[in-house]
UniProtKB/Swiss-Prot annotation:
Organism: Pelotomaculum thermopropionicum (strain DSM 13744 / JCM 10971 / SI)
An individual GO BP term: peptide biosynthetic process
Keyword Cytoplasm carried by entry: yes
MF terms (GO), sorted A to Z: translation elongation factor activity
Keyword annotations of the record: Cytoplasm, Elongation factor, Protein biosynthesis
Pathway: Protein biosynthesis; polypeptide chain elongation
NCBIfam families named in the record: efp, PRK00529.1
Gene responsible for this protein: efp
Pfam families per the UniProt record, alphabetical: EFP (PF01132), EFP_N (PF08207), Elong-fact-P_C (PF09285)
PANTHER family listed in its UniProt record: ELONGATION FACTOR P, ELONGATION FACTOR P (EF-P) FAMILY PROTEIN
Protein name: Elongation factor P
Length: 185
């Protein structure tokens, strides 16, 4: 059991038989009445986001999530396939279950698959991934004086803002938590 006063972004809780991840939370103490915690929760199985208000100090069961290293194999358009590196069992997940992680998945990439009661409910990506730029506008000499940025499409289909000196074919390090460009590699 965990108290609502101990909520943190990324925490997983069990509510009404489902697993939810805390996306946002806010402790509210009105001038009149008891304090409460307003939160946004993402259902780990379906990807649906709900808003829920709890009394401050309310005890909620914490979801016991198992992490297993798996390799991303391929996508058939709707479902994403992963293989357990120890047992060679294959697991499929929908895009809704993966959320924003689909923008950073590369074939043969090792990731942590999250399991609840033996069923896959999501993935945990490495903090940084290296991806190749497949499309961006060419940089023009003298562009860098303003220190601006331009959009670039990566090999996974994700679009990120990059500095003007980045060209097609460059490999970039991307932060998977924020989706921001870090550096050229």
């Amino acid at each position: 059991m965990i108290s609502t006063n101990d909520f943190r972004t990324g925490l997983t809780i069990e509510l009404e038989g489902e697993v939810y991840q805390v996306i946002e939370f806010q402790h509210v103490k009105p001038g009149k009445g008891a304090a409460f915690v307003r939160s946004k929760l993402r259902n780990m199985r379906t990807g649906a986001v709900i808003e829920k208000t709890f009394n401050a100090g309310e005890k909620i069961p914490r979801a016991r999530i198992e992490r297993r290293e798996m390799q991303y194999l391929y996508s058939d358009g709707k479902e994403y396939n992963f293989m357990d590196m120890e047992t060679y069992d294959q697991v499929t997940m929908s895009a809704a279950q993966l959320g924003d992680a689909v923008k950073y998945l590369k074939e043969n990439m090792n990731i942590q698959v999250l399991l609840f009661q033996g069923k896959s409910i999501g993935v945990e990506l490495p903090n940084f991934v290296e991806l190749e730029v497949i499309d961006t506008t060419p940089g023009i000499k003298g562009d860098t004086a303003s220190g601006g940025s331009k959009p670039a499409t990566l090999e996974t289909g994700a679009v990120v803002q990059v500095p003007f000196f980045v060209n097609v074919g460059d490999k970039l390090q991307i932060d998977t938590r924020t989706g921001n460009y870090i550096k050229r590699v």
